[in-house]
Amino acid sequence: MAAPAAVLGPSALGQSGPGSMAPWCSVSSGPSRYVLGMQELFRGHSKTREFPAHSAKVHSVAWSCDGRRLASGSFDKTASVFLLEKDRLVKENNYRGHGDSVDQLCWHPSNPDLFVTASGDKTIRIWDVRTTKCIATVNTKGENINICWSPDGQTIAVGNKDDVVTFIDAKTHRSKAEEQFKFEVNEISWNNDNNMFFLTNGNGCINILSYPELKPVQSINAHPSNCICIKFDPMGKYFATGSADALVSLWDVDELVCVRCFSRLDWPVRTLSFSHDGKMLASASEDHFIDIAEVETGDKLWEVQCESPTFTVAWHPKRPLLAFACDDKDGKYDSSREAGTVKLFGLPNDS
């Protein structure tokens, strides 16, 4: 049997105990049955289609919990919502009202009709797709850049450019708590159990707070440079972080140790998404491809080619379909064509 390969990259290499890197990583003995099966599927479903969504760059894409709708937020100050009809996205509505760029959005975890947008105009807005109206506008203290909805649906957390995270009651639309951090806050997320709140920061750390008390539980030295994004797997077994060192690290939720690294990207990892079964992890950056890895082995499962940097990816909650959006083309081609499009990978080749 081959000797275990060393895990390289994150700064806590070789330590043991919670919040550290596992000092070794198992070597896979060839592709798993799952990898072979998904590769076979993608060979027949490797088509990527573009759908016009906005008049400027798309910052964020997200699926409703039932997978019927995809929402996108853009530099053009609007959100768009599409219906998924078989093998295509059909634009349902455009949501206007923000006075600045829509930097991030997310859906209610269990109500497929509600989504929330975070904007540089110092507000968040909650929208209902049934009425196509904004049902609440909540004023915040700064320019908002990230947002997440708690798994129980009761709270929305929003982070701004001044590293303040505000917790807003999703029913009363009032602020419940506010935390000012002394470090650069990048992405924020609850764990699946709703009892801990995670932040990635500019020092390469993952900060964990108890929830709702918001008391510090642990700070994990995850990467030697800026820790940019974080996602929890739907099964509740792992979470993944992406960093400016171009590494994706996979962490055991209970032990808080790094179990695996993914190192196929060359540029800072901007966005991550787990597939609905928790078995695939998509990661993207300024590299002109999206890496799709098998979670349990780290093996490369597929590569989605792009013509420009990718800053948002989202797996469908029920099917192996990946929504994503890229940066505007850099003048090499007709720059107007790609600006504001949403893309869908995993469609049948003959569609």
From Swiss-Prot:
WD repeats lie at residues 53-94, 97-137, 139-178, 180-221, 222-261, 264-303. It comes from Mus musculus (Mouse). This is THO complex subunit 3. InterPro entries: G-protein_beta_WD-40_rep, Tex1/THOC3, WD40/YVTN_repeat-like_dom_sf, WD40_repeat_dom_sf, WD40_rpt. Component of the THO subcomplex of the TREX complex which is thought to couple mRNA transcription, processing and nuclear export, and which specifically associates with spliced mRNA and not with unspliced pre-mRNA. Required for efficient export of polyadenylated RNA and spliced mRNA. The THOC1-THOC2-THOC3 core complex alone is sufficient to bind export factor NXF1-NXT1 and promote ATPase activity of DDX39B. Keywords: Acetylation, mRNA processing, mRNA splicing, mRNA transport, Nucleus, Repeat, RNA-binding, Transport, WD repeat. GO terms for cellular component: chromosome, telomeric region; nuclear speck; THO complex part of transcription export complex. Component of the THO subcomplex, which is composed of THOC1, THOC2, THOC3, THOC5, THOC6 and THOC7. The THO subcomplex interacts with DDX39B to form the THO-DDX39B complex which multimerizes into a 28-subunit tetrameric assembly. Component of the transcription/export (TREX) complex at least composed of ALYREF/THOC4, DDX39B, SARNP/CIP29, CHTOP and the THO subcomplex; in the complex interacts with THOC2. TREX seems to have a dynamic structure involving ATP-dependent remodeling. It is found in: Nucleus; Nucleus speckle. Belongs to the THOC3 family. The modification N-acetylalanine is found at residue 2. It comes from the Eukaryota.
